[in-house]
């Protein structure tokens, strides 16, 4: 299907699938300006990760250098072009029948992977989580349907790859095998009680700042 909005065209195709017994919505979302979005993030990455401007790309490891600032910014304030994703996030919520948008808060961030960067096994606070790959370099993300499950589901990434699923699912991803930077954005959709829980538990020694970077989801979906 194709959308036309904000002086861009968007080709997209989303499918409802399963990871074990859990919901997965996955597919491609390809705006006509995806390359420009990628270049803008690469060129301005130091605004969110200061050491990315002073460290060699091949030596830069943002969890080590800039972990304290990893979630200290409102991603959509820095990179407003990413707001084009919200009609598709709303479509996912509608598909799963979760349409009480007023109860949710939205948080997103940018993942910048130089060569060799990866993410280790983890999950998220919130009800829903997903990611959108702006530029892939041949990586795969693996999911476990249950925390102690032996079953593993592999999702091969690509430019424009979009996912939406329950936030509690454990996942990890393979290292970036190329010199080019792999760029993606991740997002969580949480109740305010979950935001407070993450803040109070000070998860990863930065949870106390979560309240400053969440946005009421209804304000982003343009619904009353």
What are these regions (language model features)?
Residues 101-174, 180-184, 188-203:
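Catalytic core of non-heme Fe(II) oxygenases with the double-stranded beta-helix
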Residues 66-80, 108-109, 128-133, 206-214:
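Short N-terminal helix-initiation segments at or just after the protein's N-terminus
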Residues 1-18, 208-224:
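Fe(II)/2-oxoglutarate
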Residues 18, 25, 184, 205-206:
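Intrinsically disordered, low-complexity segments enriched in small/polar residues
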Residues 2-97, 118:
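Non-heme Fe(II)/2-oxoglutarate
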Residues 78-82, 123, 178:
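Aromatic-acidic/polar surface patches that form glycan- and anion
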Residues 49-52, 133-136, 189-192, 208-216:
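Glycine-rich loops and low-complexity Gly/Arg-rich segments
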Residues 9, 36, 45-46, 123, ...:
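Positively charged, low-complexity intrinsically disordered regions
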């Amino acid at each position: 299907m194709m959308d036309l909005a904000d002086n861009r065209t968007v080709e997209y195709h989303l499918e409802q699938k399963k990871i074990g017994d859990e919901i997965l919505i996955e597919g491609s979302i390809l705006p006509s300006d995806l390359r420009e979005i990628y270049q803008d993030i690469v060129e301005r990455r130091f605004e969110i990760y200061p050491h990315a401007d002073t460290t060699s790309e091949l030596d830069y490891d943002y969890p080590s250098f800039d972990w304290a600032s990893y979630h200290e910014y409102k991603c959509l304030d820095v990179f407003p072009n990413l707001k084009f994703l919200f009609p598709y996030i709303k479509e996912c919520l509608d598909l799963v029948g979760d349409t009480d948008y007023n109860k949710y808060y939205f948080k997103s961030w940018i993942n910048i992977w130089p060569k060799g960067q990866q993410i280790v096994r983890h999950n998220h606070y919130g009800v829903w989580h997903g990611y959108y790959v702006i530029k892939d370099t041949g990586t795969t993300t693996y999911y476990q349907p249950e925390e102690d499950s032996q079953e593993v589901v592999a999702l091969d990434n690509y430019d424009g790859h979009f996912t939406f699923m329950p936030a509690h699912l454990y996942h990890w991803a393979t290292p970036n095998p190329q010199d080019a930077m792999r760029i993606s954005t991740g997002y969580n959709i949480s109740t305010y009680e979950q935001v407070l829980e993450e803040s109070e538990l000070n998860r990863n020694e930065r949870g106390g700042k979560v309240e400053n970077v969440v946005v009421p989801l209804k304000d982003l979906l343009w619904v009353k």
